Amino acid sequence: MSYASEVKKELTTLEVHRENAKAELVALIRMNGALGLANRHFVLNVQTENPAIARRMYQLLKQFYDLESELLVRRKMKLKKNNLYIVRVKTGVTEVLSDLGIFDGMQLLESVPNEILDDDMRVRSYLRGAFLAGGSVNNPETSRYHLEIYSLYEEHNQVIADMMNRYELNARTIVRRSGYITYLKGAEKIADFLSLIGATTAMLRFEDVRIMRDMRNSVNRLVNCENANLDKVANASTRQIDNIEFIDATVGLGQLPTKLREVAEARLEHKEVSLKELGDLVPGGPISKSGINHRLRKINDYAKQLREEATA
């Protein structure tokens, strides 16, 4: 089961207050519902590929309304092999939709009822329903952090983004294919949203994974930094040894002042040690790291001078 499916499965098991559950139902119908006609009466079909969501819709309708409804299963015959689950309401459709505030007498409304927009818990429930209907979230263990909700209508898409941004989630919108996307990118924002809609267990798992990933990334950065420093030290040491050997081969180390000669001889004898360790090994030491570095720069400058004279 994918992480997104785990989130949705958890959400379908939540027990919520009646009016808040209605707000969730509004989102599910608003986003996945379609009206049809049969014998001059409206028929409502709400479809999903997720059986747990289908059961949730069916149970909510049964809980709130005494009407004839059924749960149908259709096998997709094209590329996708998932079943399609349809909750069908044959009677009392106009009364149900009017009670939910999403029907104008002829069609489903694109707007969200003010009764939902004006209540914090109903907003959270609506967002839960919207995620169940059209949401997805990447697995935090294997991919970049990304959560999105798909909607067919631009106005409704913007309402979802505005709802999210009441909670400072920095939701953004884009156009994709034949619809619109509201999305979140930051790990903390996604965790906040999961908590907001009631997916507490999924949120805790998400946070555990995020913390472990951050720790691994920090360790990798430290290792890379340490490796870079080691490479830098090794390259500097190689350059120093090359220069000292060049001086020795051309004029001899005896031409160096005593303090420089002692450092040069110590470096030739101890090629792998750090500057700090080299300072402890010089006969006239111990010498500080900066002191050793200063003398080695003078040796490098002298080698450069000799090379220039040799090519002049």
From Swiss-Prot:
This is Probable cell division protein WhiA. HAMAP family: HTH_type_WhiA (MF_01420). Residues 274-308 bind DNA. It comes from the Bacteria. GO terms for molecular function: DNA binding. Pfam families: HTH_WhiA (PF02650), LAGLIDADG_WhiA (PF14527), WhiA_N (PF10298). Signal peptide: none annotated. Involved in cell division and chromosome segregation. Keywords: Cell cycle, Cell division, DNA-binding. Belongs to the WhiA family. The keyword Transferase does not apply. GO terms for biological process: cell division; regulation of sporulation. InterPro entries: Homing_endonucl (IPR027434), Sporu_reg_WhiA_N_dom (IPR018478), Sporulation_regulator_WhiA (IPR003802), Sporulation_regulator_WhiA_C (IPR023054), WhiA_LAGLIDADG_dom (IPR039518).
